Every structure is written in C-alpha cells, then in structure tokens.
C-alpha cells in the first residue's frame, strides 16, 4: 500500500509540475506577467490560510526569523515567480521547464558557495554534464526557434539561482517551519505586493483578460499552489529524498509533450537528444548527493 501511495503521489506531483508551465504560458497570453503572478498568489493564499487554521499551524515564523519570513516573501515568491512567468513571454513552456529542471544542479552550486559543502566527484561530473547539455539546448533553441530569446532564458535562469540561494539560506538558518507556515503568509503578502505593482506599472486592461488566462491563473494558484505543495510534501514524507527528487527528471518531459500536443510546437531533434545527457547529469547529481534537493523550506517549488 505504501508503494502504491508513493507512486500515486509521484505521478500527481509530476503532472502538477509539468502542467504549470503550460498554464503560465496561457496566463500571460492576455494578462501582464507581474499582475498574473499577483493573481496567482491571491488565489492560493486563502486556501493556505484556511488549511493553517484547520491544522492549527501558526502563520508567523518563530521569533528571530520573522525578518527572514519577509525575505522569503520577496526573494522566494515575488521576484523568482515573476521572473518565471515573465520568461514565458519570450520562451516556450517546454524549454522553460527544461531550464527549471536544473534546480538540483543550482542547489549543488549554491551549497558549495554558501554552505561550504564539499562536492563529490560524481556530483562534479553530473554538474558538468548537465550544464554542458543545457548550454547546448539553449544555443540550439535560440538558433532554430523564433520563440526562444535570451531575455526570457536569462529571467528563468535567474529565478532558478534565486530559489537555490534561498534554499541554502533556509538550511543555514535551520528553518524548520511547517510547509503551510512557510507558504501561507508570504504568499498572501506577495500577492498583495505584485497585484498592486502590476496594477500601477503594467496597467492591465481587465476587459481584455480571456477566460482561458483567468482559469490558468486560478489553476496555478488554487491547484498547483495548494494541492501541488501538499502532494509534494506528502511525497517527501513517504518516499526517500532520492525518490522524491526524481520528479525533476519527469516533469520537463510532460511539459514538452503537452506543448507539442496542444500548440504543435516541439523543440528541435538535436535538443531532444541533448535531453538525454541533461537527465543523466541531473541524475548523477541527485544520486551522489543522496540528500533532499528540497527541504521543508523549499516545498513551494511545486508551484512552477
């Protein structure tokens, strides 16, 4: 029964992570990126706060870490999630998912730089293979696709790096709050900040918002932002760290397949072939590390 529940959770998380990239693309078709991200968090926050109330979880971090809670609001929610959806105005959702699948590699680099962790030989090999393969994919796609631009790629890579740095800071500060506490209040505050910022600077025309874009934003917030978090947290509790981390190898394939099926757009054959060494590199990084790629302070990465 435990294996069945792990398998179901793994599939749910993979599908959630894989579909969110397509949802972000649909959302920004008619809604400006910053305002769309604010809407996303505003949809998610009430559910998270209700769950916190039902489970009797505090909304505030422990004394001494409350300033860090605000840092998480800005540098975990506001900036990187805005960069993700902004990136998708220049990059197709499949390529965006492939870039974000390199989170384990970014976490390894950040851990070495900020936590003084020593990288194993296999980790270095995996990192080298993954970065080389990703570079090849990015060069191939920017040369062959009119939908892939360095402006979007830079935004997405920046989001990955910021999330990786926040992960290391959570670990360094021994941030052990529950997944609900970590997400609820920062999500609400981020929603308010981004909605206000988007309203004043992007000047969104609500009358032009399509039903598909609104539903996609609702999906990102209410489903991926709540259900996805809880499923990934449950997966981490039931499976070992390595098993849970394998989601990073699966969700990009789902994103690429969905975009091809719905939009008829597929990455080039060369890029598809380069996914093989990319997956191998990420796999080696995960195997060698044999530690959670995410922690309780990183569960919200399932909102991508």
Curated annotation (Swiss-Prot):
Disulphide bridges, residue numbers: none
Localisation: Cell membrane
Annotated EamA domain residues: 15-139, 161-287
Keyword NADP: no
Gene Ontology cellular-component terms listed: plasma membrane
Keywords annotated in UniProt: Cell membrane, Membrane, Repeat, Transmembrane, Transmembrane helix
Chain segments annotated as transmembrane: 4-24, 34-54, 67-87, 95-115, 119-139, 150-170, 180-200, 214-234, 246-266, 267-287
Family matches, as InterPro entries: AA-Vitamin_Transporters, EamA_dom
Main location: membrane
Family matches, as Pfam families: EamA
Membrane topology per record: Multi-pass membrane protein
Membership in a protein family: Belongs to the EamA transporter family.
Protein name, as recorded: Protein PagO
Taxonomic path: Bacteria, Pseudomonadati, Pseudomonadota, Gammaproteobacteria, Enterobacterales
Gene giving rise to this polypeptide: pagO
């Amino acid at each position: 029964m435990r294996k069945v529940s792990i398998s179901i959770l793994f599939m749910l998380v993979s599908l959630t992570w894989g579909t969110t990239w397509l949802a972000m693309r649909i959302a920004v078709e008619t809604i400006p990126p910053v305002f769309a991200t604010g809407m996303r968090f505003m949809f998610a926050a009430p559910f998270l706060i209700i769950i916190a109330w039902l489970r009797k979880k505090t909304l505030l971090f422990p004394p001494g870490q409350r300033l860090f809670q605000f840092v998480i609001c800005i540098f975990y929610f506001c900036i990187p999630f805005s960069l993700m959806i902004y990136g998708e105005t220049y990059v197709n959702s499949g390529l965006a998912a492939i870039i974000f699948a390199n989170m384990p590699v970014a976490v390894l680099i950040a851990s070495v730089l900020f936590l003084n962790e020593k990288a194993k030989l296999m980790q270095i090999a995996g990192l080298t293979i993954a970065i080389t393969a990703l570079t090849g994919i990015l060069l191939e796609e920017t040369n062959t696709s009119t939908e892939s631009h360095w402006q979007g790629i830079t935004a997405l890579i920046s989001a990955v790096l910021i999330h990786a740095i926040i992960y290391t800071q959570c670990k360094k500060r021994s941030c052990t709050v529950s997944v609900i506490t970590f997400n609820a209040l920062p999500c609400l505050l981020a929603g308010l900040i981004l909605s206000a910022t988007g309203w004043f600077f992007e000047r969104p025309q609500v009358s032009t918002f399509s039903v598909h874009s609104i539903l996609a934003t609702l999906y990102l917030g209410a489903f991926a932002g709540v259900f996805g978090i809880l499923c990934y947290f449950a997966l981490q509790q039931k499976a070992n760290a390595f098993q849970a981390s394998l989601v990073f190898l699966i969700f990009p394939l789902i994103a690429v397949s969905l975009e091809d099926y719905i939009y008829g757009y597929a990455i080039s054959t060369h890029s598809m072939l380069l996914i093989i060494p990319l997956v191998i590199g990420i796999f080696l990084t995960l195997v060698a590390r044999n530690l959670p790629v995410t922690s309780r302070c990183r569960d919200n990465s399932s909102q991508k």
